[in-house]
Design a protein with these regions (language model features):
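Conserved G1/Walker A P-loop phosphate-binding module
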Residues: 1-96, 101
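Cytosolic-side membrane-insertion boundary helix
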Residues: 227-256
């Protein structure tokens, strides 16, 4: 049962017992719980893979922004670095050092970065997947965490393909890249690998919307809404989902305010209304 369904059930039970004060308290607790739900997203990959740019894009931040993860030639990430979402600070995207830069084998790498705190992993590559990527995926599988492969810089890959192919077909090229990645992962024992082709500078193109939907589906319901609100507005379906989440929260705010207003406690309604501003 989702947090929302549980809250509604408890509120209805309180109202059936004519306990409006308990109902209001349940609603307020639910809203507080929503605000405190953390979401920790781990992004890792080899040097030059576009990992830090992906961290910024996922947060809706330009690389030139003061809050952006540093990007550039060479490995700039030497230890896990937290980048909170600019609007939803409980959502944190972690820029992790590439496994090849830590001198730790894959199983020790996960312990080194504190894998337990992450809700899921995104492994970023810019061209072919590296041996370290495969090893890391295998270790994450053993730990029971969800992970997703992102082939970043796909726009650059397509441009190179267009210049080198006599009969260039974008869809066929994308499909070939995707199939090659999946085949390589399967050959190394990764079960049902999920590969997404992404441009860090044009998230609305290629597979980023599908990546979003896949992560949403895999997350528990109480974290799913947190993710939806934090994702960049790259298409109309994103905006629609955000409206639905906000609409759901608004009904709890409205109920809390209306219920508190009915309680014979001087000043309590005003305090509740102020809390909604």
């Amino acid at each position: 049962m989702s947090l929302e369904s549980k809250a509604i059930e408890d509120i209805n039970r309180a109202l059936e017992n004519d306990d409006t004060q308990a109902a209001a308290s349940i609603s307020q607790t639910y809203l507080r719980d929503l605000d405190s739900i953390p979401l920790n997203i781990a992004v890792t990959g080899e040097s030059g893979s576009g990992k830090s740019s992906f961290v910024n894009a996922f947060r809706g931040i330009d690389n030139r922004d003061d809050r952006a993860a540093p990007t550039g030639v060479g490995e700039t990430t030497m230890k896990p670095k937290a980048y909170p979402h600019p609007i939803y600070p409980k959502v944190t995207v972690w820029d992790l050092p590439g496994i090849g830069t830590t001198k730790f084998p894959a199983h020790q790498y996960l312990k080194h970065i504190g894998f337990e705190k992450f809700d899921f992993f995104i492994i970023v590559s810019s061209d072919r997947l590296r041996e370290n990527d495969f090893k890391l995926a295998q270790e994450i599988m053993k730990m029971g965490k969800n992970f997703y492969f992102v082939r970043a810089k796909i726009d650059s890959n397509l441009l190179s393909a267009e210049k080198s192919q006599k009969e260039y077909d974008e869809e066929k090229t994308l499909q070939k890249i995707r199939e090659n990645c999946i085949q390589g992962l399967e050959e190394r024992g990764v079960t049902a690998p999920q590969v997404f082709l992404v441009s860090n500078f044009d998230l609305h193109l290629y597979d980023f919307p599908t990546l979003q939907e896949t992560i949403e589906r895999d997350l528990p319901s109480h974290k799913r809404d947190t993710l939806i609100l934090a994702l960049p507005n790259i298409c109309s379906s994103n905006i629609k989902k955000k409206k639905e989440v906000l609409r759901s929260q608004i009904k709890f705010h409205a109920f809390t305010s209306a219920t508190v207003a009915a309680l014979p406690i001087p000043g309590l309604s005003i305090a509740a209304d102020l809390g909604l501003q």
